[in-house]
């Protein structure tokens, strides 16, 4: 497989075989934040309702292309109702910018007049409007994840906090889906692998045994003191016993702290970081699976998929982005 296709996302997706991809990781063009100078682009619709409707149509084809246990990961930011003065237009500066609240020298989230009933300064709520629209179309909205940007751009606005996050939504096609949580375990905060301390003499005949953590629950008188200490069920380092919990890991949390990454040339100024794509791909696929990105942009999704032994299909309407993305993906000789 391993291809980047230049063309309209909806048109190209309709040519893909059904159930050919295990996972889709993508960041669609944001609403009224960019003009990329390409006819037919998504994001410049007159209203946000039309914008969302187009994305729902695209993701319906993504759903068809996913395996029954496949997942969809969508990164998207918000925008404000207002004058539209912050928008990036082609060709002056739009080539370099994608992420809504990290636009290089512009410094503020772009604003738009595209909702007739909302006065200026209204946050449009685009991420959640899209999430609910996809849910209404049949997707299972499994989780919202916060991408907290450690290097967000400062903003000149004085009557609200500086925007430093975007959303990542996890959708599933079916109730049972592939999700390898072990692949993205994170370090446990404050983990200490030393034996848990306790007062000597508190456990009768077991007072000389080292207390290291043991089962979280017991079901009553079935356990003797000996069994209690040697129980091998789920461990808790807040308990006592003779079995040691030494993993030092925990399940990934739903706030992801990571910096944006920048690149020059024709690629996006603030593409989403490799680590973001890594987490989605590693837990959403197995080696050899096909990863899809219908708005491939700078090629981060495809590049990460290739690095971890996955196949990829990337789609973008802009020929310059397609060429740049292909150039950044190394040839996999294995």
Where on the chain are the PLM-derived regions?
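Extreme N-terminal starter segment of soluble prokaryotic enzymes
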Residues: 1-3
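Class I S-adenosyl-L-methionine
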Residues: 5, 11-26, 30, 34-42, ...
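N-terminal phosphate-binding loop and adjacent alpha-helix
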Residues: 43-52
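A short glycine-rich, Lys/Arg-flanked "PGG" loop and its adjoining helix->strand segment in the class I
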Residues: 51-68
């Amino acid at each position: 497989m391993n291809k980047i296709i230049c063309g309209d996302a909806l048109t190209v997706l309709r040519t893909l075989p059904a159930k050919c991809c295990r996972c889709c990781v993508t960041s669609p063009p944001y609403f009224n934040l960019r003009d990329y100078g390409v006819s037919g682009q998504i994001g410049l619709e007159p209203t946000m309702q039309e914008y969302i409707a187009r994305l729902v149509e695209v993701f319906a084809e993504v759903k068809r292309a996913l395996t029954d246990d496949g997942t969809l990961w969508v990164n998207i930011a918000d925008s404000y109702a207002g004058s539209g003065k912050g928008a990036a237009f082609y060709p002056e500066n739009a080539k370099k910018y994608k992420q809504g609240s990290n636009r290089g020298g512009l410094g503020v989230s772009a604003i738009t007049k595209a909702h007739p009933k909302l006065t200026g300064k209204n946050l449009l709520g685009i991420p959640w409007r899209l999430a609910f629209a996809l849910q209404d179309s049949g997707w299972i909205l499994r989780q919202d994840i916060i991408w907290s940007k450690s290097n967000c751009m400062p903003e000149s606005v004085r009557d609200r906090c500086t925007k430093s996050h975007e959303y990542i939504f996890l959708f599933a096609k079916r109730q049972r889906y592939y999700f390898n949580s072990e692949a993205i375990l994170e370090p446990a905060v404050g983990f200490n692998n030393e034996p848990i301390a306790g007062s000597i003499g508190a456990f009768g005949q077991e007072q000389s045994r080292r207390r290291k953590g043991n089962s979280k629950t017991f079901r009553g008188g079935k356990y003797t003191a000996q069994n209690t200490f040697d129980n091998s069920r789920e461990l808790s380092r807040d308990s006592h016993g003779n079995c040691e919990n030494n993993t030092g890991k925990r399940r990934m949390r739903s706030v992801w702290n990571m910096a944006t990454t920048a690149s020059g040339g024709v690629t996006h100024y603030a593409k989403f970081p490799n680590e973001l794509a890594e987490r989605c791909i590693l837990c959403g696929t197995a080696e050899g699976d096909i990863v899809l990105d219908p708005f491939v942009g700078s090629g981060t999704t495809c590049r990460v998929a290739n690095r971890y032994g996955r196949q990829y299909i990337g789609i973008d309407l802009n020929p310059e982005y397609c060429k740049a993305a292909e150039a950044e993906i190394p040839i996999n000789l294995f």
